[in-house]
C-alpha cells in the first residue's frame, strides 16, 4: 500500500510540473535576515517549467510594482537589489508570508499576509496619492462638480397652497350651444307649469313696504288746495253773520257751513 501511495505522489508531482507556470503558486515566510535579501529554495524553482530571469517584477494586488534583481546559484535563487525597498514599502515583519505566482512575463504576482494569516491592507488597497492617473481623475471630477454648481440656478420656491392648487387645477372644457343641443334633445326635462295668478303675484309681489309715488302725493296736494279755498269764504261769511245776525241766524249759517264742509270733504275723498 505504501508503494502505491508513493507512485501516486510521483505521478501527481509530474502532472503538476506539466501545468502552466501561471497556475503555480509557492509560499515564502519571512525568516532570518530577510530585510536585505530573500532566498528562494531550489525546490520551488524546480517546479517551474521556465527559468527565472535575472530581473523580475513583484506586483501586489493593488498594482504596486517593484523591480528586483535575481542572483542564481546551483542551490538557490536570491532576490537582491530592489528587495530592501520592497520590504520597506510594505512593512514586512518577521513571520509575514508572501504567496508567489509566476505569470510567465518575468513578473510574479504576490499576496502578502501577516503573522496570523491576514492579508496586509497596504498591499491590497489602492493608494491614490501615488497614482497620477487616479489624481488626474479626481481633479477632473472636482472641476466638473464645481462647474456644475457654478452654473446651477436656484429653483423658485412655491408655497404649499400654490403647489396644491396648481397640482389639482384642471382645465374646464368649453362647450358651445351646438354641443349642448344634442344633449338637451336627448334628455328633455319637463317644465313645471304655473297658474297665471301665481305668475303675476310672483312677478309683482313687492319685496318691501309700499310707498306712495311722488306723482300721487303731488296730485293729492293739488286736490286738497281747493278744499282750503272753499273753506276760507265760508269762514269769512260765518264771522260776518256772527257779528250782524242773531243767535238763530248763526246756527243756520253754522249748519250751512258744516254742510259745505262735508261736501268739500266728500269731493276730496272721491
Curated annotation (Swiss-Prot):
GO terms for cellular component: nucleus. Residues 127-159, 227-259 are annotated as: Disordered. It comes from the Eukaryota. GO terms for molecular function: DNA binding. SMART domains: B3. Its main location: nucleus. The keyword Transferase does not apply. Transmembrane segments: none annotated. Keywords: DNA-binding, Nucleus, Transcription, Transcription regulation. Residues 244-259 have a biased composition (Low complexity). Residues 143-159, 228-243 have a biased composition (Polar residues). Pfam families: B3. InterPro entries: B3_DNA-bd (IPR003340), DNA-bd_pseudobarrel_sf (IPR015300), Plant_B3_domain (IPR050655). Residues 23-116 bind DNA. This is B3 domain-containing protein Os08g0324300. It comes from Oryza sativa subsp. japonica.
